[in-house]
């Protein structure tokens, strides 16, 4: 008998496998029928805003998801690379969005996820994040990104940092 948890795993696997197809679809044609897809669209907008700042000013950018979620003025002007979306998507969908902090400088974006406060929450978050990291690593390495993962502190912060490996990864317009 299939459970809701099994259905979520199948759905996530399907989405990750089809990320390249999704990335080739023009932003305006994306459907927003489920909460996860709405969240993904928001992630795309957030990263377009971040990348624009990083390209123009070459300054560090650091934002809390809660602050961004309330900003309705962010506009997406072009497609963000699939690797960025995939990594952020698996992290956000596995833990509560306000527990994700991301920052960027030059060609590197960092994602930091904090575990829950209770022991039971921490254990559950740790298991979910383990799955998320595995999926993200597989995907990002398959499209040519170097990925570094580290843990630090008593709060069990989990940082996932990536930057383009050697040469730039081709985007959907190439």
Model-derived segments and their meaning:
Residues 25-27, 50-60:
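A short helix-and-adjacent loop within the catalytic ATP-binding
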Residues 27-37, 72-74:
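Short flexible loop/turn segments at helix-to-beta-strand junctions
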Residues 33-48:
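A conserved beta-strand-to-alpha-helix junction within the catalytic ATP-binding
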Residues 60-71, 105:
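Conserved catalytic submotifs in the C-terminal HATPase_c
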Residues 96-107:
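A conserved short beta-strand within the histidine kinase catalytic ATPase domain
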Residues 107-134:
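Glycine-rich/acidic phosphate-handling loop/turn and adjacent ATP-lid/helix
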Residues 133-145:
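Conserved glycine-/histidine-rich ATP-lid loop and adjacent helix of the Bergerat-fold HATPase_c
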Residues 142-174:
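C-terminal end segment of the histidine kinase catalytic
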